[in-house]
């Protein structure tokens, strides 16, 4: 296992499960293809998994904390068939206008996990489908960040200057991407591709795109 990525922080909607607008119904939870097996492979290799999710639908009044909990239980139920469990989940329930410190890209959720589990940023990587996930990783000083092209990922990659086909294939970075602070370390088709990249990295992985 590459020690730089011992702790894997994962966005939920659009990364692990199918993106649905303000998901409040447990029946709407659907694992993205390959996600369960990818998480199992990471656990088998010794990584720890943490879910880090913004849920502003609570603060906006679109659904309740109890409904969020029901959705979470359904997710855990679906992952159980792959023998996957998260070490912990950190969730921000606030609407953007509340100005909290826990809504990504602010790093309150990282601080919560860091203090609870003695995490160090040099051994942690963030995987998500939004620019906020990449900025979160940068601000927390994490060892790496991965943008997946599921969920909002294609639009996020294009906003960052990447050339991406509508089907998410063949992402091409913008010129001098490695010098730009908001760029992910890699862009991957999905969580399964991101996991494969992590699992094959040497101790000092190069900055790359796939």
What are these regions (language model features)?
Residues 35, 39-72, 85-98:
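Substrate-recognition element of Asp-dependent hydrolases with the DxDx(T/V) motif
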Residues 24, 57-61, 134:
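Short, solvent-exposed loop/turn segments at secondary-structure junctions
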Residues 10-12, 53, 127-129:
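Active-site flanking residues adjacent to catalytic metal/cofactor-binding acidic residues
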Residues 15, 56, 131:
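Short glycine-rich anion-binding loops that position phosphate/pyrophosphate groups of nucleotides
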Residues 15, 53, 150:
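Ser/Thr-centric signal marking residues that sit
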Residues 19, 61, 197:
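Residues that scaffold the ATP/ADP-binding catalytic core of kinase and kinase-like folds
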Residues 2-4, 66-87, 96-126, 130-210:
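Asp-based, Mg2+/Mn2+-dependent phosphohydrolase catalytic module
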Residues 1-50:
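Active-site neighborhood of HAD-like aspartate-dependent phosphohydrolases
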């Amino acid at each position: 296992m590459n020690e730089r990525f011992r702790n894997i922080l994962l966005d939920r909607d659009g990364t692990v499960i199918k993106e649905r607008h303000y998901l409040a119904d447990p029946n709407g939870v659907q694992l993205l293809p390959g996600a369960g097996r990818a998480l199992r492979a990471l656990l088998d290799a010794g990584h720890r998994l943490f879910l880090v999710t913004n849920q502003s639908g609570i603060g906006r009044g679109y659904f309740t904390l109890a409904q969020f909990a029901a959705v979470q239980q359904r997710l855990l139920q679906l992952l159980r068939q792959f023998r996957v469990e998260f070490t912990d989940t950190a969730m921000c329930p606030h609407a953007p206008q509340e100005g909290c410190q826990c809504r990504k890209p602010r790093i309150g959720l990282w601080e919560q996990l860091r203090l609870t589990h003695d995490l160090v940023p040099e051994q942690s990587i963030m995987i998500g489908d939004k620019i906020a996930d990449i900025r979160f990783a940068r601000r927390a000083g994490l060892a790496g960040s991965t943008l997946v092209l599921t969920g909002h990922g294609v639009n996020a990659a294009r906003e960052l200057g990447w050339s991406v086909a509508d089907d998410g294939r063949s992402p091409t970075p913008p010129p001098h991407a490695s010098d730009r602070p908001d760029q992910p370390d890699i862009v991957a088709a999905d969580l399964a591709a991101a996991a494969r990249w992590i699992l094959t990295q040497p101790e000092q992985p190069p900055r790359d795109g796939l």
